[in-house]
Amino acid sequence: MIHNCYFQFLFFVIEYIYIMSALCGCKKNRRIIMKKFLSLALALIMALAMFAGCAQQGAENAAEEPAAAEAPAEVPAEQPAEEAAAATVFPLTVKDQLGNEVTLEHAAERIVSGYYISSSTCIALGLKDKLVATEEKIDKRPIYKLAAPELIGKVGNVGSAKAFDLEACIAAEPDLVILPKKAKDYAATLAEMGIPAIVVNPESHEKLVEMVNLIAQLTGAEEKAKALTARYDEVMKKVEGLTANIADADKPTVYMCGTSSYLTTAPKDMYQASIVTSAGGKNAGDSLEGDSWTDISYEQLIAMNPDVIIIPTNNMANGQPDFTADEVMSDEQLKEVAAVKNGAVYNMPTGFEAWDSPVPSGVLGMLWMTAKLHPEVYTMEEFAADAADFYKTFYGFDMDTSSILGETVEKAA
């Protein structure tokens, strides 16, 4: 189009020059006129070429501008694709907490949990509708009555870690089985049968978070897991801040009992030991090796001479272990132990969960222990409010804090 304009214009100029030279008669004058008009014509052609080039560049820029203007509008459209890329893609192969490789073809829809801790985790992750079988005696555990009453009497029973019911597990037709370390041999058996099974062993805060994320990844509950682990981090930072300025000399030695006997305690690598140290205490059993409840003698307990003795709940309906605080206080062999002499033998609250165990609510154990050991930095009233908010957020029920606050009122009286 532009080239045609050039030729038409040039033809017009030459024709114009010819006519003018003819009118001028004299050959000399015609040559002079011809030179002037040719110079003028060339100047005009160059000007027109420059104008056309600018016009063409402007048109190209104008054509590009809408695309540039539209680019920001494409960003939101790309975001879902990025989010989808970040989500778990199946088939998925993971390693469980014992290092076993497990592959799932799709997100689990039918879950068998043979471990109370993983069952509670599934409830906290919003997966209770996917539980088709659980550990035994769920009707005796308060958390089921409070947060998942619809499971009681409606789902299968696969026994305990010590007596796992393989047949009941298979009958539930699961596409994911979650087992504790004590039942690890059954995981291998299930794998041979083509049933994906993972083994979990959350014996530290880090391992607890790892377990939560592992279960979430296999079930499509990543968003819930993100919120839950964020709360863990929040509580950990809170406790760390509360106890940061407590001098080592002001940190009491704390003896954590087992639920079967007060001559059973938590060694240094057990989850319960981390609760004590996080809350500004010293674990009396830190000289003991291992990550499970360890039996000791009277002589060992007397030598530990703890300032505080804590008796955890047993996770069942009455929440009481196989002995009472009064039994500990009245044991003649312990009368010289500091905790007994000073009446510092305490039961953890009952009616909810064992906050000394690595369940999702285990972080509440750190807060409770902080309030018990250092009420000057964190009160039991503050703990009750934090605990109620946790259960409402992740388990969906309103917590009755009267048993916690009742203890405080009774002590004050």
Task: State where each predicted segment sits.
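A short, structured surface patch at a secondary-structure boundary
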Residues: 113-172, 176-178, 182
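Bacterial N-terminal signal peptides
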Residues: 43-49
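Extracytoplasmic substrate-binding proteins
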Residues: 86-87, 91-94, 101-103, 186-264, ...
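Alpha-helical, coiled-coil/dimerization segments enriched in small aliphatic residues
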Residues: 265-292
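Proline-aspartate-enriched helix->loop->beta-strand connector
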Residues: 158, 166-179, 195, 297-314
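Short helix-initiation/N-cap motifs at beta->coil->alpha
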Residues: 97-99, 155-167, 289-298
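Short, Lys/Arg-enriched N-terminal segments with co-localized hydrophobic residues
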Residues: 3-33
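Bacterial lipoprotein signal-peptidase II cleavage site
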Residues: 50-64, 69
